[in-house]
């Protein structure tokens, strides 16, 4: 994106070099479902059931939950379809959820990531209360694993290099339900 600068010249962001990415396939299969699944949440001594994507929380259009936004109706992307190029995937609602979640992470450092610290209420306020009671919660383990295992340096979020390490057995886009999500 070019910005107008003093003197009529243009200013643009430098290209990223050496940046690491998190895996879209793992997010789609293992992390995004957490945000749309009803969870027990403790707020002010009361336990209720709601989703992260609830209207009063992180719903895309109406949520009060800060910058983190989730589109509850985002549909999985068929990663085996040649028609779903990275450019096409990047226009999907699920990819919007992916980028929103990325904004709450410190790649390769789950303990510094708001995506975990807020719902654990770990040294930071979360208006939605305690979503995960402890770091041993299976949902925490999945999110931790995603953040701690970026794709290899120099590869983008669609890299298939992680399919054999993040899933058991190796992830097969043609049969996404044939593997399970690895976690810590």
Label the model's feature ranges.
Residues 6-184:
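Aromatic- and Gly/Pro-enriched helix-to-coil junctions and flexible linker segments
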Residues 1-4:
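Bacterial N-terminal signal peptides
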């Amino acid at each position: 994106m070019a910005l107008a600068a003093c003197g009529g010249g243009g200013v643009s962001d430098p290209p990223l070099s050496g940046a690491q990415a998190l895996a879209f396939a793992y997010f789609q299969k293992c992390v995004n479902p957490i945000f749309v699944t009803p969870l027990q949440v403790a707020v002010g001594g009361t336990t209720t059931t709601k989703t992260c994507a609830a209207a009063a929380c992180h719903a895309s259009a109406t949520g009060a939950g800060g910058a983190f936004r989730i589109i509850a109706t985002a549909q999985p992307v068929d990663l085996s379809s040649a028609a779903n190029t990275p450019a096409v995937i990047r226009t999907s609602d699920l990819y919007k959820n992916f980028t929103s979640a990325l904004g709450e992470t410190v790649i390769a450092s789950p303990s510094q990531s708001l995506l975990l610290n807020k719902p654990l209420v770990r040294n930071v306020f979360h208006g939605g209360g305690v979503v995960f009671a402890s770091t041993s919660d299976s949902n925490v383990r999945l999110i931790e694993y995603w953040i701690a295992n970026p794709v290899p340096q120099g590869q983008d979020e669609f890299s298939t290099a992680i399919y054999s390490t993040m899933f058991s057995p190796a992830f097969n886009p043609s049969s996404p339900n044939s593997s399970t999500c690895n976690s810590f």
